UniProtKB/Swiss-Prot annotation:
The active site is at E272. It is found in: Cytoplasm. The keyword Transcription does not apply. This is Probable lipid kinase YegS-like. The keyword Kinase applies. The lineage of its organism: Bacteria, Pseudomonadati, Pseudomonadota, Gammaproteobacteria, Oceanospirillales. Its cofactor is Mg(2+); Ca(2+). One of its GO terms (cellular component) is cytoplasm. It is an enzyme of class 2 (transferase). One of its GO terms (molecular function) is ATP binding. Binds 1 Mg(2+) ion per subunit. Ca(2+) may be able to substitute. HAMAP family: YegS (MF_01377).
Length: 300
């Protein structure tokens, strides 16, 4: 059956020949595929609105986790749970797509449109939305302060290098976390709220998260000075594959949670930083329909 879709392509990928070839091949199969290229902030959201006004129900995010977040935000603001999202991973880390096992080959990623789209959750933080993960504390500083030049040269390893060079500057944050049958208060070094499983270039903060369970996974790394050595171990290759090997994290799984902090805290939503002293988090079940590969580990 012919598909009608809009590909919103990150401006840095405008000359990507693999993407161009995949688009041409897809069109030659009889599908209608329009392409828009972003130039500045706000373009992705504007293109989504224009697409929906013109009868498109399927949007393809051609970019990294930030592009996926921008498009997810625009789709959620529309309020239609029948809208469909596909991903062509073209960013530095591609954390959500990597955990979902979406191919980085544009033609293969585009071919997922031949499969049924799966109902998936989106997480709301105050009036913002994200698909993959929100991070706070030290992990947020690493992600937001890693230079674009370093990311271009080293890919996901850039986040690791930034974390190691800033290790002596680690400062904890203080917060009060409350949800159904869960309450925790104290100083923490890192926080992950996961619909997906990893962030910051492969750090698996929420290794068991699912995108279709109506919940988000919570991972809190307490600021216990005796565990600082364990924090450093999170940045070596072995520990990065199993961050719970030392039992460092406080973990739970919730549909709603409130975070309160005595001073403004930065929370990074798939690359988009927001700042507040109160965060109301909610999992919105079956908010969007995603094109994911067969056997996707993020589906329960």
């Amino acid at each position: 059956m012919s598909k009608k879709a809009l590909l919103i392509l990150h401006g840095k990928q405008a000359d990507n020949q693999s993407v161009r070839n995949a688009v041409i091949d897809w069109r030659n199969q009889g599908h209608e595929l329009a392409v828009r290229v972003t130039w500045e902030g706000g373009d992705a959201e504007r293109y989504v609105r224009e697409a929906l006004d013109n009868g498109f129900k399927t949007i393809i995010a051609g970019g990294g986790d930030g592009s996926v977040r921008d498009i997810t935000q625009a789709l959620m603001e529309n309020g239609n749970s029948e809208l469909e999202l596909a991903i062509i991973p073209l960013g530095t880390a591609n954390d959500f797509a990597t955990a979902a096992e979406v191919s980085e080959e544009p033609a293969d990623a585009l071919s997922l449109l031949n499969r049924p789209a799966q109902p998936c959750d989106v997480i709301r933080v105050n009036n913002h939305y994200f698909l993959n993960m929100a991070t706070g504390g030290f992990g947020t500083e690493v992600t937001t302060q890693t230079s674009e030049e370093l990311k271009k040269m080293l890919g996901g390893a850039a986040y690791l290098l930034t974390g190691l060079t800033r290790f002596s500057e680690i400062e904890s944050a203080k917060g009060h976390f409350k949800g159904e049958d869960f309450e925790w208060e104290g100083d923490f070094l890192a926080l992950g709220l996961g619909n997906g499983r990893q962030a910051g270039g492969g750090q698996r903060l929420c290794p068991d998260a699912l995108v279709n369970d109506g919940l988000f996974d919570v991972a809190i790394l307490p600021a216990d000075m005796d565990l600082l050595a364990g924090v450093k171990e999170l940045f070596d290759s072995e520990a990065r594959q199993d961050p719970d090997q030392e039992g460092l994290f406080v973990r739970t799984r919730l549909s709603e949670m409130k975070i309160e902090t005595p001073t403004p805290m930065n929370l990074n939503l798939d690359g988009e930083p927001i700042q507040n002293t109160t965060f109301q988090i909610q999992a919105i079940r079956n908010a969007l329909r995603l094109y994911l590969p067969e056997g996707c580990p993020l589906l329960g």
